[in-house]
Amino acid sequence: MKLKDTLNLGKTEFPMRAGLPTKEPVWQKEWEDAKLYQRRQELNQGKPHFTLHDGPPYANGNIHVGHAMNKISKDIIVRSKSMSGFYAPFIPGWDTHGLPIEQVLSKQGVKRKEMDLVEYLKLCREYALSQVDKQREDFKRLGVSGDWENPYVTLTPDYEAAQIRVFGEMANKGYIYRGAKPVYWSWSSESALAEAEIEYHDLVSTSLYYANKVKDGKGVLDTDTYIVVWTTTPFTITASRGLTVGADIDYVLVQPAGEARKFVVAAELLTSLSEKFGWADVQVLETYRGQELNHIVTEHPWDTAVEELVILGDHVTTDSGTGIVHTAPGFGEDDYNVGIANNLEVAVTVDERGIMMKNAGPEFEGQFYEKVVPTVIEKLGNLLLAQEEISHSYPFDWRTKKPIIWRAVPQWFASVSKFRQEILDEIEKVKFHSEWGKVRLYNMIRDRGDWVISRQRAWGVPLPIFYAEDGTAIMVAETIEHVAQLFEEHGSSIWWERDAKDLLPEGFTHPGSPNGEFKKETDIMDVWFDSGSSWNGVVVNRPELTYPADLYLEGSDQYRGWFNSSLITSVANHGVAPYKQILSQGFALDGKGEKMSKSLGNTIAPSDVEKQFGAEILRLWVTSVDSSNDVRISMDILSQVSETYRKIRNTLRFLIANTSDFNPAQDTVAYDELRSVDKYMTIRFNQLVKTIRDAYADFEFLTIYKALVNFINVDLSAFYLDFAKDVVYIEGAKSLERRQMQTVFYDILVKITKLLTPILPHTAEEIWSYLEFETEDFVQLSELPEVQTFANQEEILDTWAAFMDFRGQAQKALEEARNAKVIGKSLEAHLTVYPNEVVKTLLEAVNSNVAQLLIVSELTIAEGPAPEAALSFEDVAFTVERAAGEVCDRCRRIDPTTAERSYQAVICDHCASIVEENFAEAVAEGFEEK
């Protein structure tokens, strides 16, 4: 036997290298085979409910890192709730209707307008479901736990029926109406868009300054006067029916030198406009208040059949332009509102594809709207005063990335204005984890217009509306519920398969259809109405969930999307918000803080991370960032997170190895019998348990990460485990001192594994498989550790906090001695302490082997004053010299008692007593040489 064999060197097969990319799928298959998700739900039956309702990602393509961050965050919350006494099922979902899928099929060569619609919709459905399957595997590979076999999908008959019923309730309350208001119109999608489908980009446009000649000055202006107008959308002049001025803005009538014409502009802008137009020696003839110009009539710049009326509008400013805007009610919300108030014609001169129509005039007909500027300039002639290119923020279709226009077309609307205050009142009752989120949603609802819910597309849920022979729209409870039942039984494709009369209840009649003839609506619903109905299609309809849901968690873009549409439909139906809490996240940016895009080549696919590092590293990364704001991710950042993971793993490996001979049922030492330092570590760890439990409850992942890493690095590695080897390796295997420390090791190991489970389930299960004395076969079926209360815990914490200060001072003294070449390692030191009464009392209270805690071979508490050479602090001073004696071959301490023993071992008296007591046979035979 060799002397080293008398040491209790920790033994474990738990590998240092995690091998996550290959091991994770093995664990995941084991969980699936064991029906772990279902077992967890059964275990929690009857406990308080917690419903995190999954916002449905769009079923198109593999998931990106933003999806991963979102789903991992949800998984951490649901797992922590499940381990904290809550029944917390998780039903993942997918959003499956809409334009992107139509675009994919178009790229694949499918021609929608050349094939049977029902066949086309079947292709859309098949593609959508294939993407659901693809993303389901992506999410499962992240280790996300949920009811993957029974997700919700917005194209299933039960969901579509629930959506129709949401619409029906809104129709019954009078919240649905048809109107021809201007809406966001995407010529690239050939459809109306909701606000949530708009994103803003910078666009360079040609802006024109031109003049309308006064036709009837109403006794205020002469007919040789021209009103100067500014526009950034020249194509809309073809539909201009008025000029809007600000009632309280001052306008001036001016005549530049050498110019026969007189012009009207805003007084505040005269100087800048004179420079722009090249006007010199401008004479101000008169000043008018805007309201004095009301109802003056001007000529259209080129269309002699059209008169343009001067009207008043609150939206006119003097921030730019001329203080006067032309008004085309068919092409803008403000224009429409003031136009209707003044009985202006709502002219629309652009078709659904962005092509100028016949009513725009023969010179314009057939041109794309963006290309008409040269024709407009030609038509304006000498009425054009200036033109310039401007860059401004402009709305784009978020899917096609093409600019959109405002365009008045008959659409179906949900009247938010009828119940706006109810919605705002409900927002006040919701808990927002970011106060700015509440303000943002509140302001959006307060300021938004009515919701255009109709779309001129094919792949979506039909609007359940019929038309009588006289054109009356029919949407009554009887017909809508009948359609809902048909959808529930056959799916929404039946709308396209059957004639209108076969979609109505048997025997249905209407006074507007004396001949019994009916037509059906061909528009479909906005996809935000699809996902915005999920509270009904899922949360209400699934018995395991509770409505309103406890939490909605999505990206911050969903304040204008899913948070918004869900809130509107839920309040419209039931008068309550669909969620009790909202937690929003920022976007995942690259390592430099730039937005990720394929064109820049700076994207990170979750699958690439899984192959290089493993999903655990992505999961740990999610907790390492403040996801309430935009976050950064790169392979370098993940590499740093991987180092943190390695530190966590190796620390826990040390605990596993050094409790391998510990049976908790037989070897646990009662708390009251622990050494002071072990009690301290137990209490410190209990503080960590509380911090982490509280942070899980508040969804504060970064707090968990920081607290965990700090505990492992500072409390364990830099202190407790630093001197632990002097105990667990050196002392007798069954000695009280070793069992005391193992008791703490094992307690921390078991509990920290449970605390880590929501974040690192793969690693936690791997550790758990080495804990043979724990009863649950999976750690995921256990509960998070409870926070305990210990006698005198505050006093113990105060004592050891003071000791840590003392230890820091001692380490400075040792460092100085090391720099002066007095010692090499700290074990070579004899440390003499010159304490005042406070420190002396402290060291007595610590009641421990202080030399062992400081990892020095000898420590002396001296009486009297410290020598001049000592390193002095306020309460204590230190001197350091080399310890007397020889190095013990077993414990490596320098000890005066170290000597060669009769059994061929050069060891100190302390080690000799351990060896002689525990290894009598080896002592009798003598040890082998080193």
From Swiss-Prot:
GO terms for biological process: isoleucyl-tRNA aminoacylation. Binds 1 zinc ion per subunit. Its EC number is 6.1.1.5. ATP binds at residue 598. L-isoleucyl-5'-AMP binds at residue 554. GO terms for cellular component: cytosol. Zn(2+) binds at residues 888, 891, 908, 911. It is an enzyme of class 6 (ligase). InterPro entries: aa-tRNA-synth_I_CS (IPR001412), aa-tRNA-synth_Ia (IPR002300), Anticodon_Ile_BEm (IPR033708), Ile-tRNA-ligase (IPR002301), Ile-tRNA-ligase_type1 (IPR023585), Ile-tRNA_ligase (IPR050081), M/V/L/I-tRNA-synth_anticd-bd (IPR013155), Rossmann-like_a/b/a_fold (IPR014729). It comes from the Bacteria. It catalyses: tRNA(Ile) + L-isoleucine + ATP = L-isoleucyl-tRNA(Ile) + AMP + diphosphate. The keyword Protein transport does not apply. A motif ('HIGH' region) lies at residues 57-67. Disulfide bonds: none annotated. Catalyzes the attachment of isoleucine to tRNA(Ile). As IleRS can inadvertently accommodate and process structurally similar amino acids such as valine, to avoid such errors it has two additional distinct tRNA(Ile)-dependent editing activities. One activity is designated as 'pretransfer' editing and involves the hydrolysis of activated Val-AMP. The other activity is designated 'posttransfer' editing and involves deacylation of mischarged Val-tRNA(Ile). Belongs to the class-I aminoacyl-tRNA synthetase family. IleS type 1 subfamily. This is Isoleucine--tRNA ligase. It comes from Streptococcus pneumoniae (strain JJA).
